[in-house]
């Protein structure tokens, strides 16, 4: 279940470290690490549409989880996401979810 977290506590991702201990890291740290890894593999080439790539990697699973949480209720999902229902519908269509 998704829980709203206070602004001072960012979204976190639980992972196991090398010693099999659970470590909670802010989502942004994981995004940074993934981007660092991606950019290091480009061999000096400049990526195109990087913003859209990263946004879609985050937005799609977020929409999926919110729609599951709301049991498909688009009005409730839009309210949770802080967007209007028409925008939500466009995003769902973009990702083949609606």
Swiss-Prot record:
Provenance organism: Haemophilus ducreyi (strain 35000HP / ATCC 700724)
Protein name: DNA-binding protein Fis
Biological role stated in the UniProt entry: Activates ribosomal RNA transcription. Plays a direct role in upstream activation of rRNA promoters.
Coiled coil feature spans: none
Family statement drawn from the similarity comment of this UniProt entry: Belongs to the transcriptional regulatory Fis family.
Keywords: Activator, DNA-binding, Transcription, Transcription regulation
InterPro entries documented for this protein: Fis_DNA-bd (IPR005412), Homeodomain-like_sf (IPR009057), HTH_Fis (IPR002197), Trans_regulatory_Fis (IPR050207)
Gene Ontology terms, MF aspect: DNA-binding transcription factor activity; sequence-specific DNA binding
Subunit text: Homodimer.
DNA-binding region: 74-93
């Amino acid at each position: 279940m998704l829980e709203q977290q206070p602004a001072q506590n960012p979204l976190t991702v639980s992972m196991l470290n090398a010693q099999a201990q659970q470590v909670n890291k802010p989502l942004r740290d994981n995004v940074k690490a993934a981007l660092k890894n991606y950019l290091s593999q480009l061999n000096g080439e400049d990526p195109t549409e990087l913003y859209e790539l990263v946004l879609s990697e985050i937005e799609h699973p977020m929409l999926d989880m919110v729609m599951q949480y709301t049991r498909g209720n688009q009005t409730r999902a839009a309210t949770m996401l802080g967007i209007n229902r028409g925008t939500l519908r466009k995003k769902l269509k973009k990702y083949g979810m609606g």
